[in-house]
Amino acid sequence: PLVYENRKYHIDFHLLEECFKHSKVFVLISPHNPTGTIWNKEVLIKIINLAKKHNVFIISDDVHADFTLTNDSHYLISSLDEWVANHSMICLSPAKTFNIPGLEIANLIIENKEIREKFIKEMMALGIHNPNYFSIPAIISLYKYCTDWVIYLKEYIKNNKKIVKEFFNEYIPLLDITESDGTYLLWINYKKLSINENELAYWINNLSRVKVSLGSEFGKEGDGFFRMNVAMPREKLLEALNRIKNGFCLLNNREI
């Protein structure tokens, strides 16, 4: 139950409570994918109060937690309340931060012993056992020795986002970029262009030869949006932006 307003998203808590009345599990994502919203402490406490009131278990997806790009702090919801710590699963991974999904490393924090043992039993039944040979040494090295690199990476991505915003403001000002607090993703509103998703896909994917994620991939609430990944070398980013601009000119039968 997210509401889009003035290039930002907020939660409709009245609707959320209605959903909680008929739910056993709530999936929280922070920073949120695809919008990049980091839910602040005040919002998380409201979610906690609803979860306690309706006895809802929380699965918190925090895999983008390292990509907090503003002054807003990221909180693990389990750190804010003892009841939630015992009724939640926190999902973390270095895969996003260090671009190593191939190592299949993830960390799950399940403080409730009974739930943790049930979860491990189900994982074993599915044939998911020990991490591969490289995973443990990799995760130890990444978390112990790579802090400076992560700081540099966050600043680089922050500047990449700024470049994209400035570029679109100059060349395609009808694109509205959602204000985000984290992740290396941009959630872009193209409704002012008065084109449908098929036309958008033809423009960016075919004419421009740039791959973006279409809003419909995220459900009906994604209509009129697309998601763009900016975690790339700046030279490649500028090439992609110029391709998008040139494709837009072709779409509108204008000179490149």
Model-derived features with residue positions:
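Hydrophobic residues in well-ordered beta-strands that form the structural core
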Residues: 1, 58-60, 212-214
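Short amphipathic alpha-helical/adjacent loop interface patches that line ligand
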Residues: 60, 154, 161, 241
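A generic structural signal for well-ordered alpha-helical segments
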Residues: 51, 81, 168, 204-205
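Active-site phosphate-binding strand-loop segment of PLP-dependent enzymes
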Residues: 4-73
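Conserved core segment of the aminotransferase class I/II
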Residues: 81-82, 86-158, 166, 249
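PLP-dependent enzyme catalytic core of the Aspartate aminotransferase-like
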Residues: 84, 194-196, 203-212, 218-256
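Conserved glycine-rich beta-strand-loop-beta hairpin in the small C-terminal domain of fold type I
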Residues: 140, 155-165, 177-190, 222
